[in-house]
Amino acid sequence: MKKKVSLLVAIMMAALIVLSAVPAMAEKTVITYWSNDRHDETYMTDMINKFNEAHDDIEINMVIMTDDFENSILLAIDGGTAPDIIGQSVTLKNMVDYNAVVDLAPYIQADEEYQKVTNALNLKFEGLNAIGDAIYWVPSGQRSGVRIEYNKALLEASGFEGIPATLAEYVEMAKKMTADGAGKTYGIGFTSSSPFERQLEMMAQVSGVFYYDYKNGKFDFSGYKPFLEAGRELVAVAYPDQQGVDNMRAMFAEGTFALWGNASQEAGVFTNQFPITAFEWGVAPVPSLDGEIKGALQVNPNKGYLMLDACKNKDAAWEVIKYFQSEEFLVGYMEGGFDLPITSYIDERIDKSKMGRMADYSLLDYESVYPAVPTINLMGDDYRTQLWNAIMGHMEIDAAIEDLNTRYNAAYDEDISLGFIKRLVIEDYDPLHPSAGTVTWLDK
């Protein structure tokens, strides 16, 4: 009996020795990514799940927040709860001044595959994704300029075939459709989230009006007056409640109003997030003041990823960024209709027949990237808020414009005098080719 017990003890001890020699499963490094994009949520989630299943060392945790994105990030940094990676929808200078973000140039320069796929070293836009030699994010694609999305059935019911070329005709179209809707449907709808930017500001752009005078290096809002006057007429006949952007998208998809303005992300929104099934919808260029194109429509390099300095596992975070911008990931993203390609490498590899409604947002020959306007320490409302307040009748139009010219230029001059920024001047600036001029930075 004693021999049996001794043998059993010996076997158990041997088993314990063997088990203790087996290494414990290492805990995954969790990399948290904050995004303010919801239109691509399904694709991002599926690809993140694929990554997490294939990797036993890194796990990606995505959090989507669409409200107050930049402030939420800064608060999280201050509170010690910051994510590791964020989407690019922030003001770069603010994040750099806050010492919040990491220069990715060393990672990029050491990775030839990443350079090949993203063309990262040639997609540096001063003040937008890069400052000097530092690169803080690399665009995966580009968002088109604003288009007019429209309900074909409501237009046809009021006798219209498409979107007119002039702002005056556009206003009259909205008025007639609202009148014909008799309180059930409306000609146009505006969101409470940056409404000026989504239509009227871009109509001004293609009319040659921009808020920064690149040739003379100063702010000038004077050209917006006719667009504000037209805006008052549009608001008077619009759907009467300006709600958040997703609520207004849902109402457009339900047929509540006929005219909506936004960029190429709406291809995914109205296919996946709020699929339109009850009517046919069209996409058209924004009208200009007189029907002529006198300025470029702004496109936005996008879907970039910034690494926060608070990240404790920067090499792991870089692996996640590399995955998000890998060939497989980006080809699927573009074919899913979530964005437009920004590099020839990806453009040549996507099957454009799979892009769905994104094809309706193919770039126009007058779309371009604008040089980033210097970020200033402004007191009071920004120009988009104030100009919309003028449209809503909360301020006189002339007074609103005069106040903006005064406040913006005073703040600009002050920041330059203190050495915070330099004056941006492009003497050979061409509004139809805004990125083609020679940039000069002045100390006064």
Regions found by a protein language model. Give the residues of each.
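C-terminal capping/gating helix-and-loop segments adjacent to ligand/active sites or protein-protein/ligand interfaces
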Residues: 130, 139, 299, 359-414
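Extracytoplasmic "Venus flytrap"/periplasmic binding protein-like
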Residues: 50-120, 153-165, 251, 256-259, ...
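Short, well-ordered beta-strand elements
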Residues: 27-38, 58-63, 85, 136, ...
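A structural signal for short loop-to-beta-strand junctions that line the ligand-binding cleft
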Residues: 75, 84, 113-154, 293-297, ...
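Extracytoplasmic/periplasmic solute-binding protein
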Residues: 129-141, 146, 168-217, 257
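Long, aromatic- and glycine/proline-rich binding clefts that accommodate carbohydrate-like moieties
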Residues: 120-121, 281-288, 334-391, 421-444
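Glycine-centered hinge/linker elements that transmit conformational signals in sensory
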Residues: 173-176, 213-242, 286-289
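Hinge/lid segment of periplasmic solute-binding proteins
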Residues: 90-145, 282-286, 441-444
